[in-house]
Each structure stands twice: as structure tokens, then as C-alpha cells.
Swiss-Prot record:
Organismal lineage: Bacteria, Pseudomonadati, Pseudomonadota, Betaproteobacteria, Burkholderiales
Record protein name field: Phosphoribosylformylglycinamidine cyclo-ligase
Family: Belongs to the AIR synthase family.
GO biological process: 'de novo' IMP biosynthetic process; adenine biosynthetic process
GO cellular component, one term: cytosol
Pathway the protein contributes to: Purine metabolism; IMP biosynthesis via de novo pathway; 5-amino-1-(5-phospho-D-ribosyl)imidazole from N(2)-formyl-N(1)-(5-phospho-D-ribosyl)glycinamide: step 2/2
């Protein structure tokens, strides 16, 4: 084959000249293989590197239904870039998807990630993937594959974006869809670990206005670490609870807060009435509200306000559920009850 014609002084171009470093990509794969290996579980067929990842549905399921979820970390990443702190956003990525599929009763089976950047920094990417693997370990699911996309010119130097994909399974007869929720049922609130991964556009605006010292102590750790605390993963304690008593409904408190997520599991004609005095508003949310001048209603629409997962059970099972979850290391409060809706009323009200 004849070489292409070019200007007399032109040098031959390589992919590296175009901004893509194949060697860096290979180095990243070598770094992250041990992290992924720690997440392996029954059902994984083959290792990392195939064109597709293979997973055998566990034989314990008689009529398995697959449940899938996908999400990102949002503009929390902008704060991660500013702080040069990349060790927690991987857990955030996993949590956002596995907590979502958990709500329908699913056991997370496997997870895939997508990491996109303009120029690949191997150490940064490896730190992120290590966090993803840690999140998978906390969830009991396998990090079965992923994609690293180095795309020159698409992202500013030092920045990247993340997407995650979780697949789980639930017995068809045990799908949790909220259909059995009735008047008199109790809404339990499980404590969040902080802001989780929603509302960070407002958080960043408040930081811009208040201009705090992010390295300063804030109730025992730096404000930066408090803001970046990884999203709590509720998978193992709630899967265990489902084996012991009927869980009627669950809501992962993400974008939209309590007032927009709990209605997603309620039948028409039912309202969850929450008592805002039933649980303490954590100091970080008080700080955000004070420095941002954020109204109560807006706080409840944007932030989790200290509740990362809502669980609905019968009144007869509430105390047993609280005891079981507390023994598993969760902080739990009775935060409300389910009643008939009044005309023109929202399906979740905070009083």
C-alpha cells in the first residue's frame, strides 16, 4: 500500500497526536482490574475485556423479573473538580441506580459504568472506578463492565462525566409496586448520609454566595467532606427486611425531595402526611437553608432533608421494621402516615 500523499514537510499523524492516548487507556484497565475482581459474585461468566459481559440469573429465582436503572452524579461532579476530590463520586454513581431498583424489591446483580473525558488522567479515573467498585461491594453486585471514552475537545481539562447502569432481579410475585398501601400505613424514614447526589446546582449557588472556607471544621469534619459525603446505599438492610415482613412501598429520595418522590409509589386517592418535627434536620441542611435563604417548601422539593429512603409498612409492622433496620446500622424514624387524600391536595404533604 502506498503512503498517502501529504505536504513535503508534514509528519505522519498518530491517534496520540489527535489527543487520544491508547496506552493510558490500557494502563487504566490494568489499574482497575483488581477493583472489579473484588466485586465478583455468583452468576458472573467471564472477566473484564470481552465485547459483552455475561451474567447468569441466579437459580433461586422461579420467575425472575429483571429491573434496570441508570443515572449519573449530576453537578456534584463540578464540586469534585473544584476540590480535586474523586474518591467518593464512584459510590454516588452506584447508589443512585441500585437504590432506585431496590425500591421495586430488586436485588442488584450487576453494574456497568461509563466514564467520559477530554483527556484521560489515569490516576483520577482509577480513583473514580475504585469508588464505583466499593459501591458495588456495598450493594452485593458485580462491576461487570464499563466504557472509558477519551474525547478530545468535548470536556475541559480535568473534567469528566459519569453514567451508571444497574440490573437486578426480583421474584415476579414479590415485585413491590405500592398497590397494597392503604390508609393507616406508616411511613418510615431512613437517614441520609448528607446531600447525596441531588440539588447540587443550588448547593453550588449557595457556596458562591456565602463563599465559605470549605476546609474549615463543620461538626467534626471539613465542610468540603461534609458536602461530598457519598450517597448512602440501602440495599443490604432493606433486602434483609423484605425477607422478614411485608414492605408495601419504598421511595428513593432523589431529585424532587420527599414531596415528589413518595407520590411515585402511592395509589390515587392516598396521601402521605409527613411530620417535619419527627426527625432532626441535619446541620448541613440548616446551613444551606440559612446561607441560601431557601424557603421550607423549596427545601422539601430540592433536598432529601436528612431522609434518603422512605419505607411504607403496616402500622402493625412498623416497630419491628424499625428494630430490624436499627440493628442493621440504619437511623430510622416514623415520619408520617398514609391517609385518604383531600380534594385538591398533593399526595405528599409536610406539616
Amino acid at each position: 500500500m502506498n503512503p498517502p500523499k501529504s505536504a513535503p514537510d508534514a509528519q505522519g499523524l498518530s491517534y496520540r497526536d489527535a489527543g487520544v492516548d491508547i496506552d493510558a487507556g490500557d494502563a487504566l484497565i490494568d489499574k482497575i482490574k483488581p477493583f472489579a475482581k473484588k466485586t465478583l459474585r455468583d452468576g458472573v461468566l467471564g472477566g473484564i475485556g470481552g465485547f459483552g459481559a455475561l451474567f447468569e440469573v441466579p437459580k433461586k429465582y422461579k420467575e425472575p423479573v429483571l429491573v434496570s436503572g441508570t443515572d449519573g452524579v449530576g453537578t456534584k461532579l463540578k464540586l469534585a473538580f473544584h476540590l480535586n476530590k474523586h474518591d467518593t463520586v464512584g459510590q454516588d454513581l452506584v447508589a443512585m441506580s441500585v437504590n432506585d431498583i431496590l425500591v421495586q424489591g430488586a436485588e442488584p446483580l450487576f453494574f456497568l459504568d461509563y466514564f467520559a473525558c477530554g483527556k484521560l488522567d489515569v490516576d483520577t479515573a482509577a480513583t473514580v472506578v475504585k469508588g464505583i467498585a466499593h459501591g458495588c461491594e456495598l450493594s452485593g453486585c458485580a462491576l461487570i463492565g464499563g466504557e472509558t471514552a477519551e474525547m478530545p475537545g468535548m470536556y475541559p481539562d480535568g473534567e469528566y462525566d459519569l453514567a451508571g447502569f444497574a440490573v437486578g432481579a426480583v421474584e415476579k410475585s414479590k415485585i413491590i409496586d405500592g398497590s397494597t398501601i392503604a390508609e393507616g400505613d406508616v411511613v418510615l424514614g431512613l437517614a441520609s448520609s448528607g446531600i447525596h447526589s441531588n440539588g447540587f446546582s443550588l448547593v453550588r449557588k449557595i457556596i458562591e454566595r456565602a463563599n465559605p472556607d470549605l476546609s474549615a471544621d463543620f461538626h467534626g469534619r471539613s465542610l468540603a467532606d461534609t458536602l461530598m459525603a457519598p450517597t448512602r446505599i440501602y440495599v443490604k438492610p432493606l433486602l434483609a427486611l423484605m425477607q422478614k415482613l411485608p414492605v408495601k412501598g419504598m421511595a428513593h429520595i432523589t431529585g424532587g425531595g420527599l414531596v415528589e418522590n413518595i407520590p411515585r409509589v402511592l395509589r390515587e386517592g392516598l396521601t402521605a402526611e409527613l411530620d417535619q418535627n419527627a426527625w432532626p434536620l441535619p446541620p448541613l441542611f440548616k446551613w444551606l437553608q440559612e446561607h441560601g435563604g431557601v424557603a421550607d417548601a423549596e427545601m422539601h422539593r430540592v433536598f432529601n432533608c436528612g431522609i434518603g429512603m422512605a419505607v411504607i409498612v403496616s402500622a402493625a409492622d412498623a416497630d419491628a421494621a424499625i428494630a430490624d433496620l436499627t440493628a442493621a446500622g440504619e437511623q430510622v424514624w416514623k415520619i408520617g402516615t398514609v391517609r385518604a387524600s383531600r380534594e385538591g391536595e398533593a399526595q405528599t404533604v409536610v406539616a
